[in-house]
Amino acid sequence: MDGIKKKMIAMKLEKENAMERAVQYEELLKKKEEEREKRENEISELNTKMKQAQIDCDEVQETLQEQMNKLEETEKRATNAEAQVAAMTRRIRLLEEDLEVSSSRLTETLTKLEEASKTAEESERGRKDLEIRSIADDERLNQLEDQQKEAKYIAEDADRKYDEAARKLAIAEVDFERAEARLEAAESKIVELEEELRVVGNNMKALEISEQESAQREESYEETIRDLTERLKAAEQRATEAERQVSKLQNEVDHLEDDLLAEKERYKALSGELDQTFAELTGY
């Protein structure tokens, strides 16, 4: 009986232990179930993430391809840009060389300008004139243009007058040569007439000896003498007229030469003034 009780107590204890283990197992099973559900949820989330990752990977691949294409285009543009840079470098080198030449010229110009400035500073009156001309430079330039036009007109008119004077001088030289020829002819004729008069005088002396015998011849000789005298007077008048004409032409030529010289001096002075004015304006 005691054995049965002990056995019953042992079985009861074992039952209680079994119940406790069952409860523990149920709790453990519940935990395992929860862990399983959690794992399944994690797996589902992982699957979702993997799908999204695949989508993202595809998008990344597409983006990568686009970036590769853009990279190729960029490399092409970079190659072209490098070629342009090389061309620009060569151009810059040429420009630098031109700049060196220009700088050298600029230095020379600045040196000349400095010398001109020093020269301008030496003259207070010139400086004031430059200041006045710089204030009214437009009006001065217009005046200079008018003066230049006037100088050009004067020069052209002087050239025309010179040509006209040269033409008149040539005509005068021809007339002078003709007058000299006529004068020489007149002088020769006068010599001939004097010789004839001398001969006539001798003849008159002979006629005086034989006046009665040569009365008619004397009248003829007197007529000849009168004719020769008139011819001599005419020759003298022509010679006088030729000398007067030559003197008149010479005076006219001298007058034209004086006018031409005056015009040239005026043109020279005006050109000098223009050159000086432009030089002062440039130096200023």
Curated annotation (Swiss-Prot):
Q: Which InterPro entries match?
A: Tropomyosin
Q: Where is this region: Disordered?
A: 111-131
Q: Determine if Transmembrane is one of this entry's keywords.
A: no
Q: Does the keyword Repeat apply?
A: yes
Q: Which residues form a coiled coil?
A: 1-284
> Which top-rank group of organisms is this from?
Eukaryota
Q: Which UniProt keywords apply?
A: Coiled coil, Repeat
Q: What does this protein do?
A: Tropomyosin, in association with the troponin complex, plays a central role in the calcium dependent regulation of muscle contraction.
Subunit note = Homodimer.
Task: Give the family from UniProt.
Answer: Belongs to the tropomyosin family.
Please give the record's comment on domains: The molecule is in a coiled coil structure that is formed by 2 polypeptide chains. The sequence exhibits a prominent seven-residues periodicity.
List the protein's name.
Answer: Tropomyosin
Q: Provide the species name.
A: Schistosoma japonicum
